[in-house]
């Protein structure tokens, strides 16, 4: 899904970036592959923390704006969207209230590679809106109203239903 990185800049100014490359890379870790020129990269280096939210269709316009406007050139980028942020009590980063699922993350490693800049973050907490949970209290992906970005067509596509459960598809091959 499309992921939104939220950080604090100078004077606790909220900055949000739409991330194209990255995601969960271990049970309690995320990987962000971003350009070091982004304001978000600078903020992550200075603060050592960020939040990572799943964007939903209800906030597609704002999420797309966060991916096209630069915090380096637009000081009121976050404010223009009308969205709201609260300070995390666990990490030095903002939580965007409108997004239904947010991972609070602490930087564990910064990697400078030939292909770019990678941030590895430890997930220290997960915040989810009750409306996206199933009867057992687990996140129901169909209730997230999430979308993905297709780099071939530059389009956003809704994630809508389960096609098959993991580990149930190829059981015949194992037998």
Task: Label the model's feature ranges.
Residues 1-175:
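Basic, polyanion-binding surface patches
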């Amino acid at each position: 899904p499309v992921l939104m990185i939220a950080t604090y800049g100078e004077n606790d100014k909220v900055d949000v970036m739409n991330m194209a490359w990255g995601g969960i890379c271990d049970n309690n870790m995320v990987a962000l592959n971003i350009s070091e020129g982004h304001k978000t990269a600078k903020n992550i280096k200075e603060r050592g923390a960020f939040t990572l939210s799943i964007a939903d269709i209800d906030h597609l316009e704002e999420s797309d704006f966060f991916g096209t406007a630069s915090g380096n050139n637009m000081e009121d980028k976050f404010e223009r969207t009308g969205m709201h942020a609260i300070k995390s009590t666990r990490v030095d980063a903002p939580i965007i209230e409108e997004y239904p699922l947010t991972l609070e993350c602490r930087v564990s490693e910064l990697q400078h590679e030939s292909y770019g800049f990678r941030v590895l973050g430890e997930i220290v907490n997960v915040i989810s809106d009750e409306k996206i949970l199933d009867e057992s209290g687990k996140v129901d992906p169909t209730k997230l109203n999430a979308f993905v970005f297709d780099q071939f067509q530059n389009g956003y596509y809704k994630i809508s239903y389960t096609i098959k459960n993991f580990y149930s598809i190829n059981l015949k091959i194992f037998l």
